[in-house]
């Protein structure tokens, strides 16, 4: 088997696994777009008012939050979605898999979900409410809770 071989690809995929993959992909696509817009703006203009920066500690511009959004939640979620769906074997993540007893994408899903809940909580404390907070906060919580269900956990558990 190669490093990109997949585990038991023909095994029945529960609906909850499809749902987790869809939620990760949705978060990933939204975060790539949002992160890009925070870093580069839309038409050269920032998508968020600079006065919001006054309430956010440790940052002077939207680049750092944009990079976290783009790379961490954007690309990270898309890679995790691929991992949940295909379960590729990547040798460099073998230690994590031995530690958890699950495919690396299970751990990534929980970390991304918990990170998203934390991110939205910090947003709620720092900037005015947005409907996106009401969408992506519960999405993060759903990722954590779904990853812990027997159907998802069992599907991603190493045999």
Language-model regions: role of each:
Residues 2-159:
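Topology signature of small-to-medium multi-pass alpha-helical membrane proteins
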């Amino acid at each position: 088997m190669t490093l990109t071989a997949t585990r038991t690809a023909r095994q029945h995929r529960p609906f909850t696994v499809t749902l987790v993959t869809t939620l990760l992909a949705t978060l990933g696509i939204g975060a790539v777009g949002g992160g890009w817009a925070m870093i580069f703006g839309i038409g050269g203009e920032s998508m968020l008012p600079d006065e919001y920066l006054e309430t956010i500690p440790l940052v002077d511009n939207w680049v750092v939050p944009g990079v976290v959004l783009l790379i961490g939640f954007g690309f990270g979620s898309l890679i995790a979605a691929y991992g949940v769906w295909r379960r590729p074997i990547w040798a460099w993540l073998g230690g994590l898999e031995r530690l958890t007893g699950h495919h690396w994408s299970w751990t990534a899903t929980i970390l991304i979900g918990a990170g998203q809940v934390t991110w939205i909580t910090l947003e709620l404390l720092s900037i005015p409410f947005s409907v996106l907070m009401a969408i992506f906060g519960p999405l993060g919580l759903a990722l954590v809770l779904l990853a812990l269900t027997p159907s998802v956990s069992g599907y991603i558990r190493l045999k």
